[in-house]
Structure formats: C-alpha cells, structure tokens
From Swiss-Prot:
Its EC number is 1.16.-.-. NCBIfam families: PRK09448.1. GO terms for molecular function: DNA binding; ferric iron binding; oxidoreductase activity, acting on metal ions. The gene is dps. This is DNA protection during starvation protein. It is found in: Cytoplasm. Fe cation binds at residues 51, 78, 82. Keywords: Cytoplasm, DNA condensation, DNA-binding, Iron, Iron storage, Metal-binding, Oxidoreductase. During stationary phase, binds the chromosome non-specifically, forming a highly ordered and stable dps-DNA co-crystal within which chromosomal DNA is condensed and protected from diverse damages. It protects DNA from oxidative damage by sequestering intracellular Fe(2+) ion and storing it in the form of Fe(3+) oxyhydroxide mineral, which can be released after reduction. One hydrogen peroxide oxidizes two Fe(2+) ions, which prevents hydroxyl radical production by the Fenton reaction. HAMAP family: Dps. It comes from Yersinia pestis.
Length: 167
C-alpha cells in the first residue's frame, strides 16, 4: 500500500517539462520571449525587404551588411523560440501572429535609395534594441536574460553600423 498523498494542483497552461524554473517565472518569460520572437521575425523580414530593394551609393556594402544582420537576427529568434519551448511554452512565429502583435510600423515599399532605407531601418532597429534592453531586466530567468543580452549587443552594433552609413 502506497503512503503517497494525492496533492491537488492547479492545471497548468504549460507543457510538461522537468525544467524546475518556477511556473510563474516560466509564464512571464515565455511571454517576453515570444514578444522578442515577433519583433525579430518582423525586423529580419524588414531587413531583407531593404536588402532587395535599395539602390544608390554604397549599395554593395550596405546590401552585404544587411545580409549579415539578417543571419544574426534569425539565429537569435531561433534561440528565443527554442527557449520558450524548453520552458513548456509554444513559440509564436506565424505570419498572422507577427502581423497582429508587432510593435514595428509597417515598412514602406515605395522607397528605393540606400539612404531612405537606412533611415527606415534605423528607426525600427532602435525600437527593438531599446525593448530588448528592457526585457533583460524584466525576466527572472537568467538563461533568457543572457540570451537577450547577447542579442542586445548585436542590435546595438547593427544600429551603430546603420546610423554610421546615414549621410
């Protein structure tokens, strides 16, 4: 005969995982991770839009620079999405979710000069860079904070590179 007690627990909105981070920390962290997934997906698509459609002085240098940014953004968003799942959540990365939840302004499709694209990109990179710095201090999960810190370093560098090319 078992001496184990039955303990009633409240239903969880999370998927089962043996990860022992407290549930309330997981829930808040997953929410913030998904906010970053959304912003990084949108920023990566915006970056590619500019990459494809710019013309003018410094085209080759900026075109190639943006390719590197896109690769790094995709790597970071993949890390965020996987961390959300590791904590028992669901990564939210569909076009519908991105369109509905992004804080970024719609990217203009009627601009063509390198300078116009750089200005539009700088505005959007700054929004994400500033928000991820807030996320670093908001999350209680240290691993996620470390991921945000790594991404923040890249975003600050990318914003600096973009702004340094604006005439």
């Amino acid at each position: 005969m078992s001496t184990a007690k039955l303990v009633k627990t409240k239903p969880s909105e999370l998927l089962y995982t043996r990860n022992d981070v407290e549930e309330h920390v997981k829930v808040a962290t997953i929410k913030r991770l998904n906010q970053m997934v959304i912003q990084f997906i949108d920023l990566s698509l915006i970056t590619k839009q500019a990459h494809w459609n710019m013309r003018g002085a410094n085209f080759v240098a900026v075109h190639e620079m943006l390719d590197g940014f896109r690769t790094a953004l995709t790597d970071h968003l993949d890390t965020f999405a996987e961390r959300a799942v590791q904590l028992g959540g669901v990564a939210l990365g569909t076009a519908q979710v991105i369109n509905d939840k992004t804080p970024l302004k719609s990217y203009p499709t009627n601009i063509h000069s390198v300078q116009e694209h750089l200005k539009a990109l700088a505005e959007r990179y700054a929004i994400v860079a500033n928000d991820i710095r807030k996320a670093i201090t908001e999350v209680e999960d240290e691993n996620s904070a470390d991921m945000f810190t790594a991404a923040s370093r890249d975003l600050d560098k990318f914003l600096w590179f973009i702004e340094s090319n604006i005439e």
